[in-house]
Amino acid sequence: MGVQGLVGEAVDRIGGEPISARMARKAPIKHLDPTLVVVTLLLSAFGILMVFTATANNESFLTRQLVYAFIGIVVLVGVGFVDYRHLKGLSPLIYSLTLVMLIAVLTPLGYVQKGASRWINLGSFQAQPSELAKIAVIITLAAFLAERKGEVNAAAVAVCMALVTVPGVLIYLEPDLGTMMVFVALTGALLLVGGAKIRHFMTLGVLGLVAIVVVLQAGLLQDYQIQRITAFLDPTPDVRSEGWNVAQATIAIASGGARGKGLRGENTQTSLQFVPEQHTDFIFTAVGEQLGFLGAATLLGLFALLIWRALRIAGMSRDLFGTLIATGIACLWAFQVFVNVGMTMGIMPITGIPLPFISYGGSSLLTNYVAVGLLLNVHMRRFL
């Protein structure tokens, strides 16, 4: 190396630290992931539009979803600028507060709708703690596994299962089978990346099968949950009740064709409101019917790009905690998209899992914005 190179290196390392690292520490915003931001905004706009059309152009739903999006963006910015590594020490507090909220739902503070107690009344709005619990589970498991630094034994796996089981039982009591399924997927993904062995997954698989048999034999599922499973297996005999949802959703998507019937299409499953809960659980049917195969494919393409960015950030993180957070978020989105879209197409049972950024609902949208904020946080601090 010449004299000029030696001088340059010395200048760059004034104070014992590369200038580039000091600049990154002072201005992490320079390392923002623009692709993730753009995809998030596109999905949000897509969702607001579909909520408006799926509710027969009801301005009340439109206004609320716009308010939720604005609040979500504010929260995203806040989450993005607080170093995510502080969350490791705060994970016990986050976990405890989540349990308190889940317990509150089961008390008189809870708001019951259609036989389920999943919400807490906040004036004219309702909060759904089970949605925010998804992020809490990711942070809690990520913090625990990161401390093990890839050395995961049977005892560590048991602790992870216990950490998930407690909120899982509370959510079962609401009841909310869909979120319980999400917890299972998150636990599996985080254990895999965190260092669990194949034998651990084999043991968990056997225990899972035993648990399913016990649940079915003991009659622990609600009648409507059993009906949804049977309707999924064969919707034809049950087409007047639970099978109606699947049948109408399939008709709506199939009738959209390649280009769809348009956002203002008349005499459609959407405009005639044949599909129940179309602005929430079944909103993908509105996408398929109004925008057709091309619109649905575009939406799924945006989801694929979103999940890819999350996985890329997981690979770029400088620590295991950041990798686990990003992996959990990627799994969260991938699982929810797969189940929700599969549910509307009749290849998955109806579970009430929302479509990220698209389904109507403040708690779901806020949860997804928090997830994006965490990803941006990990990405911006990958050099620190």
Where do the model's predicted regions map?
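N-terminal membrane topogenic signal
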Residues: 24-40
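Glycine/serine-rich anion-binding loops at beta->alpha junctions
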Residues: 123-133, 173-175, 257, 261-262, ...
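A juxtamembrane structural motif centered on a specific transmembrane helix
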Residues: 1-23, 336-384
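Short hydrophobic, aromatic-rich alpha-helical segments embedded in or entering the lipid bilayer
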Residues: 244-251, 278-282
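Extracytoplasmic/periplasmic regions of membrane proteins
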Residues: 247-254, 259-263
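Hydrophobic alpha-helical transmembrane segments of multi-pass inner membrane proteins, especially
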Residues: 36-247, 285-345, 370-374
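Long extracytoplasmic/lumenal interhelical loops at the membrane interface
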Residues: 258-291, 321
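Re-entrant/interfacial helical elements at transmembrane boundaries that shape
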Residues: 182-183, 264-271, 302, 344-352, ...
